């Protein structure tokens, strides 16, 4: 009988001790199951013992004999190692099971040849008893132990891998880096499977091992462990630092939050105090303005209600200041009449000249005699007045000089009275405006300093239009003054009309919101109060508009007017350079604000309610259709806006150029070039603008020819002949370096060489 393994073959009949240690395939599986369930103490668990009892009795006896022999050989020499001990050691040291040392197939066919008799069982039990009594010696003398067929070279080392013969090591698994667990081929036969009886093993079974080797030593492991401990300490230290930093940051956040709350509270207190102070100041200003208005009512005049039939009208009554001026004017007129009468009497007493002194005397005697004869002067009871005595020539000239001086003095007084009257008229205009403002403010629902949108504190009313009120307000967020325009819709309007008005206001807001230029009033905000009220917040300008200035001063110098026109044209150029371009369409003195209230300062353009957007859809080569014909201020619109036809007229930015020309003319001459004393209805009915083919300039005041030429270019009747905004911006009259013409410079140089004409005569003065 021969036993064949992966390391070689052993011939000879096996002894009973060999048979007792030769496991069957089923016993090998049971052994593996038992070893897998064996705790580190070496004693199998209850589950493993239950599996052993469930086996065939014959196999159970073989396994018992094998484990008994292994247990007895565990204390012997190093050549015969105990499998159970090795399994227990492997589980503790290298985490290998007993199956990794000798993988046994769990499958073994039951054949009649392998059945043994009762005697073999008895001999096996006898061999087991001998193994127990020998305690580590070789089993019997009839054969070898099954462990003798495997030549262990590693001695009794702790790892089973060290005791595996080199011949049966798998080269594929010797360099494997997988986890230290056994890998057993399921179909490989066990090398310890021996045939019982006289039947040899037909097919040898091969063993497959998975070997893990490492270069780590205890020092390296200790170093790695120490490094790991240091890393953990560093990480823990870093975590502690981060936790402390996090705590510090949280503490700082809490402190900053408390500080923020404190600042918010302080800010709210400041805002509340600012509101209180602003309201107090506004209240005092209202009181002072009303007191001043009451005083001016007596001095300048006031409105009185007069009944005319069934209606009542307001009539203006002048105050004592105007009455005194009227009395002074009457006294001056009376004095002038007296002086004229005395001058006539003085002319009668004018002495005759030396040549004519004798002729009147000779001729007077016959006349006297004739009168006496006819009238009977000698018997006439009436006494005739004596003829005025003739003055000497010196006396006559003396009286004549006195009368001339008195007339000159009266003329001077009359001029002063006229100047004072004009000044009082300007003050009266302010007074009338203030009276209307106070009346409108008293009737307004926003008179009690409300805060709109939780931001804008209303101070006092600036003015009132048809459907809007403009208040001076204070922005509590930005800490600046602003002008709040409150649009109030008529509650009796239809919803369609309200929607159109609101749409128009939103359109103005969208246009104005995108504009950013120093010569255009900025639009800050837009919000609604209710369904019938919405507000727009504009930049606040301290001064008045140009229309009020012209009403006060009638006109201005050419330099001041030119400065205003330059700023207007600069703003128009900006409106035509943005995309899409914009036509203002409502340029007039009322929409030009004087920042300082004077003509020598900055201006700003406002009111884009009628402006037109020249987008690609509506603007063509000839311009865009005028869809709002009839709107605007007629004195400042060009003739093409009044053309009535089947199709609407075409307009372009030349509409604003015409308006610039009219404004410049009005600033220079104090009157409008077309329809000055006409109403808008008269202008529309009489076609005044359509007939304005040429502009006529008054004689006074004197204006330079360059300014007149500039006005003619702006007021060209045909829009094809009129400048556009870009051409107007490049006009030589508006360029600072063109104020001195080349021709005048040449004449000046010629005058220096030919005549002693002063150099200033060749400079164009405005």
From Swiss-Prot:
- Compositional bias ranges of the Basic and acidic residues kind: 43-64, 105-121
Regarding tissue, the record states: Widely expressed. Present in fetal placenta, liver, kidney and pancreas but not heart or skeletal muscle. Also found in adult cell lines. Isoform 3 is ubiquitously expressed in all tissues examined.
User: Transcription regulation: present as a keyword of the record?
Assistant: no
- Domain named Protein kinase: residues: 456-734
- Which reactions is this enzyme annotated as catalysing? L-seryl-[protein] + ATP = O-phospho-L-seryl-[protein] + ADP + H(+); L-threonyl-[protein] + ATP = O-phospho-L-threonyl-[protein] + ADP + H(+)
Query: This chain belongs to which protein, by name?
Result: Serine/threonine-protein kinase tousled-like 1
What is stated about the way this protein's activity is regulated? Cell-cycle regulated, maximal activity in S-phase. Inactivated by phosphorylation at Ser-743, potentially by CHEK1.
**What function does this protein fulfil?**
Rapidly and transiently inhibited by phosphorylation following the generation of DNA double-stranded breaks during S-phase. This is cell cycle checkpoint and ATM-pathway dependent and appears to regulate processes involved in chromatin assembly. Isoform 3 phosphorylates and enhances the stability of the t-SNARE SNAP23, augmenting its assembly with syntaxin. Isoform 3 protects the cells from the ionizing radiation by facilitating the repair of DSBs. In vitro, phosphorylates histone H3 at 'Ser-10'.
Q: Where is the composition biased (Low complexity)?
A: 20-33, 68-85, 170-192
Q: How the protein assembles, per its UniProt entry? A: Heterodimer with TLK2.
Q: Where is this region: Disordered?
A: 1-197, 346-383
InterPro entries reported in the protein's UniProt record:
Kinase-like_dom_sf, Prot_kinase_dom, Protein_kinase_ATP_BS, Ser/Thr_kinase_AS
Which BP terms does GO give this entry?
chromatin organization; chromosome segregation; DNA damage response; intracellular protein transport; intracellular signal transduction; protein phosphorylation; regulation of chromatin organization
User: What's its EC?
Assistant: 2.7.11.1
Q: Which organism is this entry from?
A: Homo sapiens (Human)
**Phosphothreonine sites (modified residues):** 38
Task: Name the principal localization, coarsely classed.
Answer: nucleus
**Compositional bias (Polar residues) spans?**
1-19, 87-103, 353-365
Q: Which cofactor does it need?
A: Mg(2+)
**Keyword Transmembrane helix (UniProt):** no
Q: Which residues form a coiled coil?
A: 230-281, 397-445
């Amino acid at each position: 009988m021969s036993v064949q393994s992966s390391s070689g073959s052993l011939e000879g009949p096996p002894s009973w001790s060999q048979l007792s240690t030769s496991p069957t395939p089923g016993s090998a599986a049971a052994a593996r199951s038992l070893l897998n369930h064996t705790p580190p103490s070496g004693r199998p668990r209850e589950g493993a013992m239950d599996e052993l009892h469930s086996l065939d009795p014959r196999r159970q006896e073989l396994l018992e004999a094998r484990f008994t022999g292994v247990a007895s050989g565990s204390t012997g020499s190093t050549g015969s190692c105990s499998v159970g001990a090795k399994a227990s050691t492997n589980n503790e040291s290298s985490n290998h099971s007993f199956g990794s040392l000798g993988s046994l197939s769990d499958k073994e066919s039951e054949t009649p040849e392998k059945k043994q008799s009762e005697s073999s069982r008895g001999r096996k039990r006898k061999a087991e008893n001998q193994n127990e009594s020998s305690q580590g010696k070789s089993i019997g003398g009839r054969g070898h132990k099954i462990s003798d067929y495997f030549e262990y070279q590693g001695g009794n080392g702790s790892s089973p891998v060290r005791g595996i013969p080199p011949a049966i090591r798998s080269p594929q698994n010797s360099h494997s880096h997988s986890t230290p667990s056994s890998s057993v081929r399921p179909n490989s036969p066990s090398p310890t499977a021996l045939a019982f009886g006289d039947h040899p093993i037909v097919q040898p079974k091969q063993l497959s091992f998975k070997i893990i080797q490492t270069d780590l030593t205890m020092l390296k492991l200790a170093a790695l462990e120490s490094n790991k401990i240091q890393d953990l300490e560093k990480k823990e230290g870093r975590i502690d630092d981060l936790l402390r930093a996090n705590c510090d940051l949280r503490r700082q956040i809490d402190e900053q939050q408390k500080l923020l709350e404190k600042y918010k509270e302080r800010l709210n207190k400041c805002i509340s105090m600012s509101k209180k102070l602003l309201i107090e100041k506004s209240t005092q200003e209202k009181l002072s303005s009303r007191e001043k208005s009451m005083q001016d009512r007596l001095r300048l005049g006031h409105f009185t209600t007069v009944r005319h039939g069934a209606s009542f009208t307001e009539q203006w009554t002048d105050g004592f200041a105007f009455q005194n001026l009227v009395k002074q004017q009457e006294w001056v007129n009376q004095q002038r009449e007296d002086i004229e009468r005395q001058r006539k009497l003085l002319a009668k007493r004018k002495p005759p000249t030396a040549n004519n002194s004798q002729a009147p005397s000779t001729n007077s005697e016959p006349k006297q005699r004739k009168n006496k004869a006819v009238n009977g002067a000698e018997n006439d009871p009436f006494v005739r007045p004596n003829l005025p005595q003739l003055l000497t020539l010196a006396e006559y000239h003396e009286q004549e000089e006195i009368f001339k001086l008195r007339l000159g003095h009266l003329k001077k007084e009359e001029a002063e009275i006229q100047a004072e009257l004009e000044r009082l008229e300007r003050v009266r205009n302010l007074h009338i405006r203030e009276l209307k403002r106070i009346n409108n403010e008293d009737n307004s629902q926003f008179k009690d300093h409300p805060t709109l949108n939780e931001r804008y504190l209303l101070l006092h009313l600036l003015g009132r239009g048809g459907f809007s009120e403009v208040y001076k307000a204070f922005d509590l967020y930005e800490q600046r003054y602003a002008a709040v325009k409150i649009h109030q819709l008529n509650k009796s309007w239809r919803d369609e009309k309200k929607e159109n008005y609101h749409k128009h206001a939103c359109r103005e807001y969208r246009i104005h919101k995108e504009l950013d230029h120093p010569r255009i009033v900025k639009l800050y905000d837009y919000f609604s109060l209710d369904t019938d009220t919405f507000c727009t917040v504009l930049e606040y300008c301290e001064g008045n508009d140009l229309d009020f200035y012209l009403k006060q001063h009638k006109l201005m110098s050419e330099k001041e007017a030119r400065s205003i026109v330059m700023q207007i044209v600069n703003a128009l150029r900006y409106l035509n350079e943005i995309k899409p371009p914009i036509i203002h369409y409502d340029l007039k003195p009322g929409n030009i604000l004087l920042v300082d209230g004077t003509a020598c300062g900055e201006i700003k353009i406002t009111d884009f309610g009628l402006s037109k957007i020249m987008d690609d859809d509506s603007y063509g080569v000839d311009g865009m259709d005028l869809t709002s014909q009839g709107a605007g201020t007629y004195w400042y619109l060009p003739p093409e806006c009044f053309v009535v036809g089947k199709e609407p007229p075409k307009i372009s930015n030349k509409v604003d150029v015409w308006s610039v020309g009219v404004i410049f003319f009005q600033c220079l001459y104090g009157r409008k070039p077309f329809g000055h004393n006409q109403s808008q209805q008269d202008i529309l009915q009489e076609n005044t603008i359509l007939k304005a083919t040429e502009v006529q300039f008054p004689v006074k005041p004197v204006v330079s020819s360059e300014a007149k030429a500039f006005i003619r270019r702006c007021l060209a009747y045909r829009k094809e002949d009129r400048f556009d905004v870009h051409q107007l911006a490049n006009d030589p009259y508006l360029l600072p370096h063109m104020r001195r013409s080349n021709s005048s410079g040449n004449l000046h140089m010629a005058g220096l060489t030919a005549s002693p004409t002063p150099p200033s005569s060749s400079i164009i003065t405005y």
